[in-house]
A protein has these predicted regions:
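Soluble catalytic domains of membrane acyltransferases
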Residues: 94-294
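C-terminal terminal-subdomain/extension
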Residues: 270-326
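Membrane-anchoring hydrophobic helices of lipid-metabolizing enzymes
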Residues: 4-134, 138-173, 242, 315-326
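Intrinsically disordered, low-complexity mixed-charge segments
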Residues: 1
Length: 326
């Protein structure tokens, strides 16, 4: 059983420290002939950190080495780039994070859905993997588009890659246009507050932000699908945040993790944590009256019910997971 947010922070940080110490030792001493000191943790001994990191670096390094097809939709998604990235996404989902996904069989495949999940860090690995999981389960449907924070989509080095893989700037207008044209959407209503959670606050959902995306679902009668994602928050565990240097480069905060900036660019790679994704029963919206959008009390109730369901799914996933590493 995963220790989760309700147990000893000291014990959880000690496991994280052991794992990262083992990871740093293997990376820095790849060419050394000295015998390695084993970490006394079964799940760490079974996982080959060095091989996983080397393969991940190779796969990330091969991205973008293909000409664009020119067949790009209005939001920038490129089928050629997406096809080229599927092997990497399969590797991340099946081998690197060993993601267990449940509940997708209850999803309506006949119309667009709004998937609403807990936010898991600055980089949108959660949206990428959830989108990939839904597409694999429903291969005849369009790939869901995942909403990305505005500040991240404005970074010149990030925006093209995210857009090519289905990332869309998070705003009500984009969500409405996608749902109206039959595309499912993945949203993270915690916003920056959720992305900025430090390690001690992991898996405790923050208050949802403005309800623009959920209003778009109401307008389009798209079911709200709660999703709990566990594993992504430990992939880049934030120990603390530095605000001053972040503002200088246009970021909401600069995360300090056990590997970044200590390992330099290598520290930007995510850790091979164990992921569990639980998709809950959709919340249908067809029965809500025409005036639901103007009823703030009703809307607040729907949003709070959605948040509670996501927190329950996260807690269930933590109960199921043996540890952050598998």
């Amino acid at each position: 059983m995963d220790s989760g947010p309700g147990t000893s922070e000291h014990d959880e940080l000690e496991v994280l420290h052991l794992a990262l110490s083992d990871l740093r030792r293997k990376i820095r001493s790849r060419s050394s002939t000295r015998p390695e000191t084993r970490v006394d943790n079964e799940s760490l001994r079974e996982f080959d950190w060095q091989a996983a990191f080397n393969e991940l670096r190779h796969r990330f390094g091969s991205l973008g080495m293909v000409e664009r097809s020119g067949e790009v939709d209005e939001f920038g998604m490129d089928d050629v780039s997406l096809d080229r990235s599927r092997m990497l996404l399969d590797f991340l989902m099946d081998r690197y994070w060993r993601a267990e996904v449940s509940g997708l069989d209850a999803i309506d495949s006949g119309g667009p859905n709004l998937f609403v999940a807990n936010c898991s860090g600055l980089l949108p690995y959660d949206g990428l993997i959830l989108s990939h999981a839904v597409e694999r389960w429903h291969p005849t449907r369009d790939r869901p588009r995942f909403l990305v924070a505005d500040w991240l989509m404005t970074l010149p080095f990030a925006q093209p890659y995210l857009a090519q893989l289905g990332g869309v700037r998070a705003c009500r207008e984009n969500a409405d246009r996608l749902l109206r044209t039959g595309h499912s959407v993945i949203a993270f209503p915690e916003g920056v507050r959720g992305a900025a959670k430090v390690f001690a606050e992991r898996y405790r959902l923050k208050r949802f932000g403005r309800s623009g995306v959920i209003r778009a679902a109401l307008e389009n009668r798209a079911p709200l699908v709660p999703v709990g994602i566990v594993g992504a928050e430990e992939a880049h565990p934030i120990l603390f945040k530095a605000d001053l240097p972040a503002r200088a480069i246009g970021l909401p905060f600069a995360p300090v993790t056990p590997t970044f900036p200590l390992l330099g660019p290598l520290g930007l790679l995510p850790l091979p944590t164990k992921w569990i994704i639980r998709v809950g029963e959709p919340i249908p919206l067809e029965d809500l009256g025409a005036g639901a959008l103007d009823d703030e009390s009703l809307l607040s109730g729907v949003i709070e019910e959605l948040r509670e369901r996501i927190q329950e799914l996260v807690s269930e996933a933590l109960e199921r997971r043996a540890s952050a590493w598998g």
